[in-house]
């Protein structure tokens, strides 16, 4: 059950209207998870500084069970997420940051329990 959070200082009108849907589909493909299990949040107009500059930028946090736990996995995922974000947002790669957060099943609650028991 991946959780993907995109923060950007771009304004709402500067990002594709269907960015959350596209990011959901891209995440499912990149991580090899069913689209129905992907959770996406997109926040625009956020006050952000990357590399000492408030020029247009974005940060993507990818949290998931089992598929973001190694450098090798994340290197492959990183290239694909960077391609998606540069294409969708028109940002240079040096204005994009990714953060991979491995999760354990007991850290995600759903249906009154945690994923460990589902």
From Swiss-Prot:
Catalytic activity entry: D-dopachrome + H(+) = 5,6-dihydroxyindole + CO2
InterPro entries linked: Macrophage_inhib_fac (IPR001398), Tautomerase/MIF_sf (IPR014347)
N-acetylproline sites (modified residues): 2
Superkingdom of the organism of origin: Eukaryota
UniProt GO MF annotations: D-dopachrome decarboxylase activity; phenylpyruvate tautomerase activity
Family statement: Belongs to the MIF family.
GO terms classed as biological process: melanin biosynthetic process
GO cellular component terms given for this protein: cytoplasm; extracellular space
Quaternary context: Homotrimer.
Keywords, alphabetical: Acetylation, Cytoplasm, Lyase, Melanin biosynthesis
Gene name tied to this protein: ddt-b
Function according to Swiss-Prot or TrEMBL: Tautomerization of D-dopachrome with decarboxylation to give 5,6-dihydroxyindole (DHI).
Protein name as annotated: D-dopachrome decarboxylase-B
Entry-linked SUPFAM superfamilies: Tautomerase/MIF
UniProt keyword Cytoplasm, yes or no: yes
Enzyme Commission number(s): 4.1.1.84
Compartments it resides in: Cytoplasm
């Amino acid at each position: 059950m991946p959780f993907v959070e995109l923060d950007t200082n771009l304004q709402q009108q500067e990002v594709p209207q269907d960015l959350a849907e596209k990011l959901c589909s891209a995440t499912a493909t990149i991580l090899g998870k069913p689209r129905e299990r992907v959770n996406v949040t997109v926040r625009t107009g956020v006050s952000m500084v990357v590399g000492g500059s408030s020029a247009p930028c974005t940060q993507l946090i990818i949290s998931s069970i089992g598929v973001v736990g190694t450098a090798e996995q994340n290197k492959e995922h990183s290239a694909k997420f960077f391609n998606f974000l540069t294409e969708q947002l028109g940002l240079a790669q040096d204005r994009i940051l990714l953060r991979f957060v491995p999760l354990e099943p007991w850290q995600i609650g759903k249906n009154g329990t945690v994923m460990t028991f589902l």
